[in-house]
């Protein structure tokens, strides 16, 4: 296993939006920063799950596409020369006798004076379509993740699911695809009422209460057989692509074994964002405290708190309260 013997000031576990802003802010405090991310790209769930969706609750943006927000955060972080390690899952974190943290991933050993974990809800995997033939089409036209809506231009698309993601994808695909069908096992959708109303008023073909029972095709899915729940109706739908939105299963995985105080699958932190382990901080959806609200906007506020207190932990003479950013960049 490779070993990076350089001891960084701050190592961030998780390269989602909060992790990216944490890395930028670490640069603001002149800290050497490393990000370790398990996915092949930065951006976390924004990039992996809904890059094309709009976000409406980030201060200063009436609306912003998820991937655009990630790109902006990456550009912001690029003001500093931060080290990024992709496709590395952190398996263990140990605070050594000398106070330095040793982080072991599936590929490499890292060392750091402090650690800030911004891993969202932990590792996440999509709930799969439980049909015998589903797996064979995953590299063809059965999708759990969507990178680019334009790949469905002029196509017949079936969306499976009844939550916010399923309804949102169906509505976004309507003006692009040739035909969109949404298939849900209940008559009532779990999505926000406004989205469901928009769905009912759209040209999307709503099929409820139906479940898929068979995928027909050789190398690609050509048709879906659906059957009515507690009924006798059966239909066959011609498709070019199938999008599965049954939600995701998230897990803290090995994080539970790192000696951190865990409460309801979240890491307990103090007002300084420090965990029960001195020098180990958390920010974003991964952490909890009294009154915690799990929003990207909240995580953006927690990141500077974690970094500034990590800086003071490393150097007790350092100010927790930083200079204003305008005074730091106006001459650069």
Swiss-Prot record:
Cofactor: FAD
Superkingdom classification of source: Bacteria
Pfam families in alphabetical order: Pyr_redox_2
Enzyme Commission identifier(s): 1.18.1.2
Protein keywords: FAD, Flavoprotein, NADP, Oxidoreductase
Entry's Gene Ontology molecular function annotations: ferredoxin-NADP+ reductase activity; flavin adenine dinucleotide binding; NADP binding
Chain residues that bind FAD: 37, 45, 50, 90, 124, 285, 326
Cofactor note: Binds 1 FAD per subunit.
InterPro entries: FAD/NAD-bd_sf (IPR036188), FAD/NAD-binding_dom (IPR023753), Fd--NADP_Rdtase_type_2 (IPR022890), Ferredoxin-NADP_redctase_2 (IPR050097)
Catalytic activity of the protein: 2 reduced [2Fe-2S]-[ferredoxin] + NADP(+) + H(+) = 2 oxidized [2Fe-2S]-[ferredoxin] + NADPH
Gene3D superfamilies: FAD/NAD(P)-binding domain
UniProt enzyme class: oxidoreductase
Family membership: Belongs to the ferredoxin--NADP reductase type 2 family.
Subunit structure as annotated in this protein's UniProt entry: Homodimer.
Listed name of the protein: Ferredoxin--NADP reductase 2
Organism: Bacillus licheniformis (strain ATCC 14580 / DSM 13 / JCM 2505 / CCUG 7422 / NBRC 12200 / NCIMB 9375 / NCTC 10341 / NRRL NRS-1264 / Gibson 46)
């Amino acid at each position: 296993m490779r070993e990076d013997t350089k001891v960084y000031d701050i190592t961030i576990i998780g390269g989602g939006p909060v992790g990216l802003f944490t890395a930028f802010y670490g640069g603001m405090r002149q800290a050497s920063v490393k990000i370790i991310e398990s996915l092949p790209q930065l951006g976390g769930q924004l990039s992996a799950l809904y890059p094309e969706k709009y976000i409406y609750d980030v201060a200063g943006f009436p609306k912003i596409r998820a991937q655009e927000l990630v790109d902006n955060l990456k550009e912001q972080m690029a003001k500093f020369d931060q080290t990024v390690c992709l496709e590395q899952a952190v398996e263990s974190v140990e605070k050594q006798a000398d106070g330095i943290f040793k982080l072991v991933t599936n590929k490499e050993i890292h060392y750091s004076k402090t650690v800030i974990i911004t891993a969202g809800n932990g590792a996440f995997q999509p709930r799969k379509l439980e049909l015998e033939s589903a797996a064979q089409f995953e590299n063809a036209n059965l999708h759990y993740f969507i990178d680019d809506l334009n790949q469905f231009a002029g196509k017949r698309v079936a969306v499976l699911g009844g939550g916010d993601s399923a309804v949102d994808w169906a509505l976004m695909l309507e003006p692009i695809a040739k035909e969109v069908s949404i298939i849900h096992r209940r008559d009532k959708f779990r999505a926000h009422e406004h989205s469901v109303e928009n769905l009912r008023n759209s040209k999307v073909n709503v099929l409820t209460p139906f479940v898929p029972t068979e995928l027909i095709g050789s190398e690609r899915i050509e048709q879906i057989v659906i059957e009515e729940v507690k009924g006798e109706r059966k239909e066959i739908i011609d498709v070019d692509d199938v999008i599965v939105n049954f939600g995701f299963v998230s897990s803290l995985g090995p994080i539970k074994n790192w000696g951190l105080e865990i409460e309801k699958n979240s890491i307990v932190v103090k007002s300084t964002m420090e965990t029960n382990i001195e020098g180990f901080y958390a920010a974003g959806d991964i952490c909890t405290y009294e009154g915690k609200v799990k929003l990207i906007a909240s995580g953006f506020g927690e990141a500077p708190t974690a970094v500034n207190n990590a800086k003071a932990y490393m150097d007790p003479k350092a100010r927790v309260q930083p200079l204003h950013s305008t005074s730091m960049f106006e001459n650069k």
